[in-house]
Amino acid sequence: MSSGLWNQEKVTSPYWEERLFYLLLQECSVTDKQTQKLLRVPKGSIGQYIQDRSVGHSRVPSAKGKKNQIGLKILEQPHAVLFVDEKDVVEINEKFTELLLAITNCEERLSLFRNRIRLSKGLQVDVGSPVRVQLRSGEEKFPGVVRFRGPLLAERTVSGIFFGVELLEEGRGQGFTDGVYQGKQLFQCDEDCGVFVALDKLELIEDDDNGLESDFAGPGDTVQVEPPPLEINSRVSLKVGESTESGTVIFCDVLPGKESLGYFVGVDMDNPIGNWDGRFDGVQLCSFASVESTVLLHINDIIPDSVTQERRPPKLAFMSRGVGDKGSSSHNKPKVTGSTSDPGSRNRSELFYTLNGSSVDSQQQSKSKNPWYIDEVAEDPAKSLTEMSSDFGHSSPPPQPPSMNSLSSENRFHSLPFSLTKMPNTNGSMAHSPLSLSVQSVMGELNSTPVQESPPMPSSSGNAHGLEVGSLAEVKENPPFYGVIRWIGQPPGLSDVLAGLELEDECAGCTDGTFRGTRYFTCALKKALFVKLKSCRPDSRFASLQPVSNQIERCNSLAFGGYLSEVVEENTPPKMEKEGLEIMIGKKKGIQGHYNSCYLDSTLFCLFAFSSALDTVLLRPKEKNDVEYYSETQELLRTEIVNPLRIYGYVCATKIMKLRKILEKVEAASGFTSEEKDPEEFLNILFHDILRVEPLLKIRSAGQKVQDCNFYQIFMEKNEKVGVPTIQQLLEWSFINSNLKFAEAPSCLIIQMPRFGKDFKLFKKIFPSLELNITDLLEDTPRQCRICGGLAMYECRECYDDPDISAGKIKQFCKTCSTQVHLHPRRLNHTYHPVSLPKDLPDWDWRHGCIPCQKMELFAVLCIETSHYVAFVKYGKDDSAWLFFDSMADRDGGQNGFNIPQVTPCPEVGEYLKMSLEDLHSLDSRRIQGCARRLLCDAYMCMYQSPTMSLYK
């Protein structure tokens, strides 16, 4: 997508700003001229139209033959000014802009925009509306009533519209607010009975339907309507000046909001004369329109090629995109009486054919751009769909079917209007590309009908051949169709279970995952085929691979091909700040989880995504005492996990399973490929038994021998006086109570929180100290006197809890201060010990107050909730520079589907880390917004690094 970034400064006087808004249909990657860094503007972003003041306060069309460009100020990135091609954006009205802007995920925003009916219904949702709310993905929807409608924050030119909903019935207690947002009471309800959501999480409950998701009439509906008076693909003429021009009908329907005006017709002209891009009032009505050759006119201005053209017999209303809105379906479309026919079952092959969501009888097919559905394949695989036409599979058009009167009622709606052919390559050869396993949630262009999302329905577990979602399948044709099953279910109005396949090759007339106006999955355009499940067979080309024996081997199957990640030989340091952010955030980012791997995925992400503290582990040459698979493990970690993660932001489950298999080679280690494990088990096996890493920590207890370990588990009794402890306090308490000291300053310190198992936590919240001062925990290190700041000579453990002297701090004193402190009657019996100091300590350092501090920085936090590990990592210096990672954030398919990892920014964490401990203690955990609750309440391991020490280790 061509675009230009003019500046990153505040847009002020050089531009007029008009209240016109556009949605980006393509992603922009543009260069910031100041920093020379790429700025990513994803598709689905919303921009406000701007005009150079020197041009004037209006839009000026480009010269003929040149591409029109539009200047936009991106609302989510208000300092960026883009100039984009007009074809890469779609204009949206301000009311739609407000509804869409509240949806922060640009892909979900674009998906909702394409569902025109649902978006329009969003305008009807107001205070008092009964709704259902989707609180969490994959869970049931809760009933509620809208109590607030409006912006939460009004800091932009236009603000997103949010809905404050009071949850009812089983939803009570499932919310997170009582109507208060950032200290402001926006509505009132009981505690934890309210939520603030955008339209994408909302569904309007109406008396006459099942909500926003049921706005399209399906084939099971008994309502009958009169079809549009002009056939799609019929030939027509129109007067242009003194001449007559011809074209093909690509749209015939009423316009939304203008139903009283009657039908309008979109005509694809034979000659390049046109003025319509397929949109009306910001809504896409026709995907095949081209502004250079398409016109939109009232039906009275259109001359059919045959003025006496017979009207089609009435049939079930498979409503087109213009008919889908209930409001429009009743205008100018009288009901037609008559019996409806049930397609029934047939012994021979038949096809449904749908265009723009409507069932259409056979007709001349000039442009193969239509979704289609194979109703049935003959039980004998040798019998082909070609029974319907001897020319099937060739480019010539099929013979004209018999008239409607000659068809039986069961066959009336089943015809073959085009030749099914695979799309040729540019060189004329047939395309045989590898399986397309795309799982992107939206298409890059607005080239599909705005469709309703698929209604929830139970998926079939498979058929007699053991096929299920994710299986490689074929439809026995000549030539066969190969693909991956993406969906199994029973659409409304059909008695058979269908399979939705994503085909290997493009096929004329296939969709991008929609069937009869409903989206069941998403793939590239012209690759979605819907066929009866019983007509599918396992892919004969890979018979030896089916079925996959178990979950351990599944991630090495061909079905995982679309999720593979790269191999990178070159050593790669972590990318930080904005550069790292651009690489890492989004869906299918991070490390893909599979089969109880979250403990390992999250630990690796914490250790390597944005830290190089342990990079020496990846570089040490093999020694004679190393295990035989040392090099294999190290190379796998370096080239297939760490380097790809840092460059591309993604590692697939196949690579992680290879590592899990290696872990099981260790004697006394088992279950790493299948069972739930804890991070400490993984670290001990990897670091101690396989890589033989020099222990990260060397700790001495009361003059005993130094003990080596790779992480430190905090053991202590609960202090009832402390509400929210910091990591600094916990570590010092634990060391004081156990009389421990670090024998060496660590370069990487992994601290395990005081909790027992996955469930019992000693503290409800723990404050993750961003900086850890370990000076007082080190042996042979100069330390400051707690009283005067001079060189400390003695340490007293019994003074630790004394409230009169820096309560809760380790106490060390110079000789003079120690004498004075222990003259107090309460401290006369204290036993204090000399502080161990370096033998060659320069005398002038401490006399001039130059006693250095050893500090470590927090770089990651590993969390667990209900046996599932997730990670928080810090990608920059700012307190809000936090990312949240979940290796199993989403799912593609059912039991044998695939997990989709996701990395999301969570800047709200920074705000909570600025709060005082008292405020955090008094804050109800359920009121903590976003991901921050998991960081503060579910911490399992906190990881610190020393920027200076890591240079030497």
From Swiss-Prot:
It comes from Rattus norvegicus (Rat). It is an enzyme of class 3 (hydrolase). Phosphorylated on several serine residues by IKKA and/or IKKB in response to immune stimuli. Phosphorylation requires IKBKG. Phosphorylation abolishes TRAF2 deubiquitination, interferes with the activation of Jun kinases, and strongly reduces CD40-dependent gene activation by NF-kappa-B. The keyword Transmembrane does not apply. Residues 153-198, 253-286, 489-532 form the CAP-Gly domain. Its EC number is 3.4.19.12. Gene3D superfamilies: CAP Gly-rich-like domain (2.30.30.190), Cysteine proteinases (3.90.70.10). The modification Phosphoserine is found at S384, S415, S419. Residues 327-346 have a biased composition (Polar residues). It is found in: Cytoplasm; Cytoplasm, Perinuclear region; Cytoplasm, Cytoskeleton; Cell membrane. Belongs to the peptidase C19 family. Transmembrane segments: none annotated. Signal peptide: none annotated. One of its GO terms (cellular component) is ciliary tip. Residues 106-590 are annotated as: Interaction with TRIP. The active site is at C598 (nucleophile), H868 (proton acceptor). SMART domains: CAP_GLY. This is Ubiquitin carboxyl-terminal hydrolase CYLD. One of its GO terms (molecular function) is K63-linked deubiquitinase activity. Residues 589-947 form the USP domain. Residues 391-466 are annotated as: Interaction with TRAF2.
